[in-house]
Amino acid sequence: MQTQANKDQVLAYWAALDAAHADDLGAVCAAHLAPEFTWNGPAPMSLQTGPTAVSKVFWQPLKQAIPDLKREIHMVFAGASSGRADGGTDGETWVCGTGYLSGHAQGQFLDIPATDHPLRLRWGAFYKLRQGRIIECQMILDFVDWFDQIGLPVLPKSRGIAHVYPAPTGYDGVIRGPQDISQTAETLRMGRQFLYGGLNRYDASGLTSMGMADFFHPNVKWYGPGGIGACFSLTEFETLHQTPWLEAFPDRKVQTLDALIAEGALLGAAGVAGVCATHSGAYLTTPASGKPIAVSGLDFWLRQDDKFTENWVFVDMVDLFAQMGEDLFARLHQQIATRSARPQ
C-alpha cells in the first residue's frame, strides 16, 4: 500500500540524516527530497525552498552544534488528508512523526550557546508526498523548551509541568502495518468534530460551550510546548492552558489545515496558519497588542474508544510572540548577557 511505502520513505530519510556526518547532509537531502521541496520550519528559519536550503539552514548547523545528535521516534503514521474546514478532502497524502532529538551541544546553533548540557529536544514533523516523492515538510523544534533546559528561560515558569513528552501510553505509536479502516475512519471523524464542531463552537460564554468533555477523557494527558507545559486531566487542561489561552485569544478559530490525517487510533494535524485570532488579552505576561495573529502548530492525538486520552502539542512560540511584538531570541540574548555578567 502507498501509505506504508510513504512511511518507509520518510523513515529511510530520517535514518540517512541520523547516520550522516554534517558535511554529507546536503547529499542526503538531495537524495531523499524532491528538487521543488519546501520546508516550513520554526521561526526564525521559517520557509526554505529546495533540499540544499534546508540542509544549509537547519540540518548541517544543528549537527555541527550537536555532533552526537540522536533521534528518538515516539510516533510515525500516515494517511490521506481531510483538513478542509468545509469537510472536503484535499487529495494529499502525508506522513507525520514526533519524538526527541537528543545530544550534547558542543557549539552554537542560532546563537543558542553550547553548554554541554544533555539535551532532549521535542520535534514534530509532517511530510507531504506525491507519487512517492517528498515535496514538503512542516516541522517544529521546541526552542522555548530548549532555552529552559539550559537555564535561559525566555517565558515565565510554565503553569503546567515542564519537560514532559512521553511516547503513547499502551499503544505502539510507530505504525508499520495496515490498520483497521473503520478505526481509522472513526479517529478522523472524531478529530474533525473536535476541531470544527467543538473548539470552533466557543462563544465566550464559558468553556462548556465547546463540549470538551465529549472529546477528552477526564484523565486526558495534554503535553504542551515549552512555556505552557503538560496537564494531567481535563480539569488541569482547562485551568492551566485553555482558560489563559482563550482570555488572550477569545476569537480564535481553527482554519482549513494543511494536513489532518489518521491511522488506526492516532490523529495528526498541521497548519502553518492553522488557527487565527486577535491578541485581545495578556498572554504569559505579554500585554494585549490588538494584533491579528496566525498560530503555526502541530498536534498528535491518541483515541481510546470514544475519547482522546493523550494530546501532544507543538506551537511555534517564537513566531507567535513575534506577531505579538516580542522577540524571544532577543530575550535569550538578554539572558545570556545577564548570566555572563554574574560574578564567577
State what each model feature region is.
Residues 1-344:
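C-terminal and inter-domain tail/linker signature
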